[in-house]
Amino acid sequence: MRISAELLQDWRNRALRLEEEVGKAILGQQETIRLINVALFARGHVLLEGDVGVGKTTILRAFARAVGGDFERVEGTVDLMPGDLIYHTYVDAGGTPRIEPGPLLRHGERLTTFFFNEINRARPQVQSLLLRAMAERSVSAFNREYRFPFMSVFADRNRVEKEETFELASAARDRFMFELRMPTPSETGVRRALVFNPDYHDVDALLERVTAEVIPWRDLNDISAAIQR
């Protein structure tokens, strides 16, 4: 894709619109919104840190809605295995074993936002699989390769509890474009609104404020490559 001044201006306007839409659901996190937006257009991944309740999941769901495509969330636990990201096995009502696609595969190429909550609770083998998927935007399973070229990975770490956690190695952390600290809002007006305004107590209603798919997400890779030239 050749980039022109008009195209660049058009995408700048789209990026600003994206921030504006996310801001409809999020208060007091303008810097975090801007940096996630930068990572999105640079096709980088983000490691988030922040206290419980600062809105990490909400901000990612807002971005996922504004960007379009599909959102997936996985909880890091000590008993999570690499295969759990790929497939899910169960026995149906008739007693027949079944295999269904796991969180990495079930959306196909529509997967745009993948959130791994508390990544340092997952075993190193699980972390390694995720890091490979981040680097290659693909995984191999069932004798074939599955690709998700539009996926952006976001993860956060539990910084409070140390038991049954597996800290990310420096090489693994390098796979993330940014390590962002989401602060607790300090402005009095923002804190008051978050506590006392009932609009901010219903996340699903908040997300309805965000206009869906304000950018053509299938073009993100092309525009990112064009910008970096």
What is each of the regions a protein language model found here?
Residues L48, F115-F116:
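Hydrophobic anchor at the beta1->P-loop junction of P-loop NTPases
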